[in-house]
Amino acid sequence: VSGYDCAKKVKGRKRHLLVDTQGLVLKVVILPANITDAEGGQKLLENIKDTFTRLKHLFVDGGYKRTWCEWVEQTLGWSVEVVQRPDANFRGIWWPNDKPFPPELEQELLKKTKGFRDFVVIPRRWVVERTFAWFTFYRRLNRDYDLLPETTEAFIYTTMSRLTLRRLVEMVREPRQK
């Protein structure tokens, strides 16, 4: 299973993850790179409502379009919040060089572009990115070596089990040391 995503210039596979607020993987699906985020999100959430009954709200990035969000709300009954940069839909304005720029418009433009193209911490978006960063510590998940996508999914679940177990051991050891 392999594909090519022209927008991201990625050849191979994409990992679609459903994580909780702490970044622990609930479900993972590996699909070809030519599958869009919305299609991958639908594959990820197929037959999931009975498994995670307490799940009510999803935080997603801008790759998931309005039609996907409506599909989730209608099919699963969950609310969806698209987490984006504050300047995600602002591209700037065009103004002719030979005319002076009005000061009142300049002040309004400065308010809109505050943080434009600078690093901005986006709440909730970093949770999934942190989970992907955890995978880079495991050589097997750093690249896609496996022939079958199910093998990669199994290694992701194994890695998350190991990380969770390590956290539990640290929680048990800490009270004893005090």
Residue positions per predicted region:
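C-terminal domain-tail junction helix/linker
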Residues: T151-K178
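Helix-centered, glycine/charged polyanion-binding patches within enzymatic domains
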Residues: T53-P149
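Polybasic low-complexity intrinsically disordered regions
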Residues: V1-P86, M160, P175-K178
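Generic helix-packing signal
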Residues: L45, F135, L163-L165
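Catalytic-loop motifs flanking and including active-site residues across diverse enzymes
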Residues: G40, V127, A154-Y157
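Intrinsically disordered, low-complexity regions of eukaryotic proteins
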Residues: A7, Q22, T131, D146, ...
